[in-house]
Amino acid sequence: TPYVRLVNDEKSSGKEVLLTWYYGIGYEYYSIDSTGYYNAENAYDKYDKAAASKWGCSVLLKNTATGFSADGITFEASFNRYITDEEIEDGVSPTDTKLPERNYSTDVTSKAATERATAMAIEADKVEFTDCAFLGSQDTLYTGNSATNMYFKNCRIEGNTDYIFGDGNAVFDGCELRFFGYSTGSVGGYITA
């Protein structure tokens, strides 16, 4: 749907509007169907598991979302930040034996546990974000392909590895790029890919 606008109408009082999700690449969940996206029936049935598409993105702006804008919204990929009850209940399990199991005692902010998980994946053109935050670790913000154009004003983008990636045409005006870091010490990372 084109020209949708999300606005935090209480941002002046310090209230946060948070859109978050817990999917990460390399893991399967009951709530994902064969398309790689959330399915309410699968979440209820808890019968088969599948892996996420599009880096397990919390929010996906499809190419039909032309002119989307957001003001004062926080978009978060919680996968490399903390474990949620919902993630555990969704039967999270690694697709490869080299990946760590995820449970309440897993240090998900360690370098070894870091995996791709996107807070915002943009495939739409002419999108705009003002006073928004994008929180993640690896691959926080996907800017789409060379046909997408976007504008970020006074936004904060956090991550530690390629946390801004894609071929999209993006302008960052007065934005803060913040290195999220790892719990396991000073390990460097790359801002863009």
Mark where each language-model region is:
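Sequence-level preference for short, compositionally simple segments enriched
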Residues: 1-193
